[in-house]
Amino acid sequence: MNKLKSNFILNIVILFTILIFNINFINCENQKQQQHQQQQQQQQQQSSSTTTTLPIYSIKFSSETGFTIYSGNDSTSIAQSGFSNEMMTMGWAYLTITTNSQFEDSLQAEAAGYIEGYLTFEMIWQCWYNILVNEYQNQTIPNQVLNWANENIAYMKQQVATNENDPYWINIGLVLTQLSGMVDGYNAANQDPSRQLSFLDFILINMDADLGDISSTFNQSTSFSEISNFKKSMDHIKKTDHCSGLIKLTDDLTELYSAHTSWSSYINMLRIFKSYNFKFSSITNIKSKLTLFSGYPATIASLDDFYLLDTKLVVLETTNGLNNNDLYYLIKPESVLTWMRVIIANRLANGGQSWCETFERENSGTYNNQWMIVDYNKFVPGVKVRDGTLFVLEQVPGYIEFADVTNVLRTGYWPSYNIPYFETIFNMSGFNDELTDSSDYEAYEEDARSQIFRRDANKVYSLTDFQAIMRYNNFQNDPLSHGDAANQISSRFDLNSPDSQDYDAFGGVDSKVTSFSLVNQLLVIAQSGPTHDQEPPFQWSSANWSNIYPSIGMPNLYDFGWVNFTDISYNY
């Protein structure tokens, strides 16, 4: 009898336990479903705002008159472009260019550059002025810099001429042609002779991120004294140029987010979100015709970097930098700079592996970054994350390493915060010398942003959550910041004490986010300016910043919201 009673009680306990488990499981699934529905509603709301109507221009060419730009969307023209400068209303300008496959590739590229230079000429001059005054300290650019750039251009042109059947060099040639067209378009629109710019000037703007490492190759003897001030400026840029990146897989596998927050001097907040849709012929072997990216006046690469491609690849990077002077001798003009190699890799790749293999060619050893390539073709919502979804590549002079790191992503997220992931790159970059008190793993894992991502990344359930983490800065109340506004996902060096060593108009200057759902719409959501979620908006007129840093073309107050960008329109 007692045995029967005991069995009865045991069965009751088991049934009760199963019941509680099922209730908890159902509640958990309901919660996930609600979160997923909320996420979908947010994305629908993000993409359902009133779309702004862009003025459209077309461009044609004749041997007698050259290029002519006229109003209207002429499908028989070489290219059509829409442009609107909304810097004062949303913190971005927007540019879209589509070329016509009926014309030769070189004419498409030149026309695309020309119409961009023509339509954006005012912003290009503003960008050049800000760079000249702030980065070059209004001095003549040193001959060593100009000579290096000219040697690099000559090398590429020679390779283009020699390898006329190689898609890699064919596309390098088209990039140079596009930039040459932009120079001509800019100078045609600019009526002030004192503001004429050369092809080399445009090259210098595009190679701005590479210049920090190039300047470190110059001999520092007294015979090169003219380099001194320039190099000090470039060393500062290289030392402080960082970003935050995050790839986040939701717990229920229904969504995969990708985002990037650029860190830069606030002088670089003159922004254009760009869409290039180039219809080049099969000889170029391009896989991606359409590129949507966050950029700047006069640049044909992102430089942040953040790209959404029509091949459903998302490409982003954060800067690792180089703390090892022993590698600078490997940086030679006989190479292709990073800003151009990423364009070629974007065009020629059909996945993470091929992107890395293309980017690996002609390593310049400059602008040494951690690159993340997210292949949304490999992602099956709610089912699995297939191998090849996330590739990571890291570079130093003379060496590149890459790997499929999807297994790391399967644990929930991949963070990026300016410390190399691969041990060989970590050691070659000199991080082992900089961080002698801790092991490589500890240095990688215990960075402030690493700890913030570890604490907060798995709390991301929706698009709104994801946007918030990329704009996060609560340094006064977050113990992980140690009271430093720089130790946050979106830094604000300007909020540190004026007495501190790193007090400056520098920090996170934007955020760009996308996801599986948004990639299928060719949609990126972006916000311009320093974060103001938990902190006050940045204002040039405060703390005398406008007297320290000329910032023509920019609004005084950066309190803008998020903007939706597609390949043909934007809304906010």
Swiss-Prot record:
Which EC main class describes this enzyme?
A: hydrolase
Name of this protein: Phospholipase B-like protein B
State the EC number(s): 3.1.1.-
- InterPro entries membership: PLipase_B-like (IPR007000)
Q: Cite the entry's keywords alphabetically.
A: Glycoprotein, Hydrolase, Lipid degradation, Lipid metabolism, Secreted, Signal
Q: What family is reported?
A: Belongs to the phospholipase B-like family.
Q: Where in the cell is it found?
A: Secreted
Q: Name one GO biological process term.
A: phospholipid catabolic process
The source's domain of life comes to Eukaryota
- From the record, what ranges are coiled-coil? none
- A GO cellular-component term linked to this record: extracellular region
Functional description taken from the UniProt entry: Probable phospholipase.
Signal peptide limits: 1-28
| Residues listed as glycosylation sites in the UniProt record | 73, 138, 219, 427, 544, 564
The primary location reported for this protein is secreted
**Gene Ontology molecular function, alphabetical:** phospholipase activity
Q: Which organism is it from?
A: Dictyostelium discoideum
The portions of this protein that span the membrane are none
